[in-house]
């Protein structure tokens, strides 16, 4: 990383308007409750449009019919996307049945969307149904607090069903970190759960009265799997085990992928190592990292407000020293660890606890009854008989976890009956991913989720033609440069530029530790496929044994590696 660290600890200047909004929100209340009772519009007005994000929702509309409604002098068809807080992605079959029923009866699209942040989203909830959605989550033992905006978002944890004891310990820490960093305001309970207002003054001892400068993402990672893509996250705890038991964490900070087209002051960044800590220091270090970013993060320019820019401004050594001072903990040298991959192991695996775990490939994470593929009904049928739990993965798949040997056949029979298991799915498709994008995401510049399935079919044909049809390239599509599809950690990454046009990035690796460089800018699908055809042909003919596509692209000089993204990402 860059060694040019000479910036101020605190950026002075006129604060971004989001800071005013938070300051005036009365600890995230705003006038959301009043807006809920306004039947003249299906949306939220003014500051509430942004404040609801702290409560786990985004106001969206169906962009496919936006122009048509405008011609009819109608407002956009406003509906909310609601995202659950589900640290580690673990939920019970009973919780699944509850959300399945709600999605079918109370959303415009009838689907459950598993996200690459290990939770689920409802798309298309009308304003009149929002309170019942939050109350349903509460009844199920869930909530949507702090799954969006300037807070610590849903905490990820490696979906490792084989190392059952280690996973259990890591998962417990993911939950504890999530709970420790939650907002303390009672606004969520008052507005959505109709709990009484209390006279006590709100305080936010960790997040502060204006919360964080920007969104903040955290992971707990169990090597050698990097399924959570730690380098896309602000704060990461890499599990270090001794004889199968968790003893501590290597802490890495400052990863992030969001950029803005045309703004070279924005760039992706991999996370930097702070050092090793024993498990008993985990919450103290987590809090210290968050409060340091709270106080030092840029509140004048939201495009430069994330932790990665704070590190580039003040330097990793200065940041580390401040975290140590606040936590009263001194980092030890980083313990050895390595990553070998980040894909999910689709199909059955047996854990050391003798339980079986079935990972189901869910293309794009969209659980819906498709013609001939009634996935949503199938998941509900499995939930009715499953005695273990469900684990949502950061690759948008679902694990039916903790299956006893005697129950394995009945679970598999249902999975096959409802097309949740398909032996014909290629390795390439399993290693391809897209964000939601159009028609619901207001930031989308190009298609992603709707684009990916057929695009992968074209890539599969190219792979077969070059004799590598049984192999895979980590392929990701994100509909805009905000990076939700994590394309800037892929071997082939497409970043939406306009309808039908993408920037093509090459040179990431399978382990997710290298940022790909832009190879072609603003090109069409046909142009992308021509480029991929030529490049896969070279890879198939010239690669070294076991050399991944991204590694080949670097070695062959097709693209130069991104070594210091603050300086060379745009070179």
Swiss-Prot record:
Name under which the protein is recorded: Sulfite reductase [NADPH] hemoprotein beta-component
Positions of siroheme binding: 484
Record keywords: 4Fe-4S, Amino-acid biosynthesis, Cysteine biosynthesis, Heme, Iron, Iron-sulfur, Metal-binding, NADP, Oxidoreductase
GO BP term, pick one: hydrogen sulfide biosynthetic process
Annotated EC: 1.8.1.2
UniProt keyword Ligase present: no
Cofactor: siroheme; [4Fe-4S] cluster
